[in-house]
Amino acid sequence: MPTISQLVRKPREVSIIKSKSPALENCPQRRGVCTRVYTTTPKKPNSALRKVAKVRLTNGYEVISYIGGEGHNLQEHSVVLVRGGRVKDLPGVRYHIVRGSLDLQGVKDRKQARSKYGAKRPKKA
């Protein structure tokens, strides 16, 4: 335990919490324009073609963000909404694109977890 005079000389250091999504600048989401839409392969134990997009945000940042769900209608110059949240098996992907918002449509024929994929409630037969 330090003495009071030691604490007066050198106060306790407050640990700085580093943001996991710095490009959002403490906002819940950010709008951006797709500069490139492509697929990439995940890290070692997994194997797939993951859909990602390089997005230029309104604050000038350029980030790589993940497009969740089956199938999408994104292309270059599409306007999208970007939220935080990384993809564990894709290095450098620290953001997600919000489905069913702006230019990105929701997942077609989605029955469960619809709100996460911007899918409307199916019509009763």
UniProtKB/Swiss-Prot annotation:
Gene3D superfamilies given in the database record: Nucleic acid-binding proteins (2.40.50.140)
Family annotation (SUPFAM superfamilies): Nucleic acid-binding proteins
BP-aspect Gene Ontology terms: translation
GO CC terms in record: small ribosomal subunit
Alphabetized GO MF terms: rRNA binding; structural constituent of ribosome; tRNA binding
Alphabetic keyword roster: Methylation, Ribonucleoprotein, Ribosomal protein, RNA-binding, rRNA-binding, tRNA-binding
Record InterPro entries: NA-bd_OB-fold, Ribosomal_uS12, Ribosomal_uS12_bac
Superkingdom field: Bacteria
3-methylthioaspartic acid, modified sites: 89
CDD domains: Ribosomal_S12
PROSITE patterns for the chain: RIBOSOMAL_S12 (PS00055)
The family this protein is said to belong to: Belongs to the universal ribosomal protein uS12 family.
Summary of subunit composition and partner proteins: Part of the 30S ribosomal subunit. Contacts proteins S8 and S17. May interact with IF1 in the 30S initiation complex.
Function: With S4 and S5 plays an important role in translational accuracy.
Matching PANTHER family: 30S RIBOSOMAL PROTEIN S12 FAMILY MEMBER
Name used for this protein in its record: Small ribosomal subunit protein uS12
Native organism: Bordetella avium (strain 197N)
Taxonomy of the source species: Bacteria, Pseudomonadati, Pseudomonadota, Betaproteobacteria, Burkholderiales
Gene name per UniProt: rpsL
